[in-house]
């Protein structure tokens, strides 16, 4: 199973790049934007969404056990 860790925690630079890149691709392919913004570039929008903590994603890290990182809170 694993351990669930809630925010605050630090993503690695690789996790951050993967999350923002994947979200930017989704936005470029027509996915709805999760925030109100004036920006038009998918990468800039994804970065702003990441900084606000609204991207619904769970990161799975491999340590001695699996660690699940959840940053968003939808409810």
UniProtKB/Swiss-Prot annotation:
InterPro entries: DNA-dir_RNA_polK_14-18kDa_CS, Pol_omega/Rpo6/RPB6, RPB6/omega-like_sf, Rpo6/Rpb6. One of its GO terms (molecular function) is DNA binding. Keywords: Cytoplasm, DNA-directed RNA polymerase, Nucleotidyltransferase, Transcription, Transferase. Its EC number is 2.7.7.6. Pfam families: RNA_pol_Rpb6. Its main location: cytoplasm. It is found in: Cytoplasm. It catalyses: RNA(n) + a ribonucleoside 5'-triphosphate = RNA(n+1) + diphosphate. It comes from the Archaea. GO terms for cellular component: cytoplasm; DNA-directed RNA polymerase complex. GO terms for biological process: transcription by RNA polymerase I; transcription by RNA polymerase II; tRNA transcription by RNA polymerase III. Belongs to the archaeal Rpo6/eukaryotic RPB6 RNA polymerase subunit family. Part of the RNA polymerase complex. DNA-dependent RNA polymerase (RNAP) catalyzes the transcription of DNA into RNA using the four ribonucleoside triphosphates as substrates. This is DNA-directed RNA polymerase subunit Rpo6. It comes from Archaeoglobus fulgidus (strain ATCC 49558 / DSM 4304 / JCM 9628 / NBRC 100126 / VC-16).
């Amino acid at each position: 199973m694993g351990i669930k860790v809630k925010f605050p925690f630090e993503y690695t630079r690789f996790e951050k790049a993967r999350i923002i890149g994947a979200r930017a691709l989704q936005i470029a392919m027509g996915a709805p934007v999760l925030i109100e913004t004036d920006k038009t570039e998918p990468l800039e929008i994804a970065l702003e969404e990441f900084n606000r903590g609204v991207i619904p994603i769970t990161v799975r890290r491999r340590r001695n056990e699996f660690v699940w990182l959840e940053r968003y809170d939808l409810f």
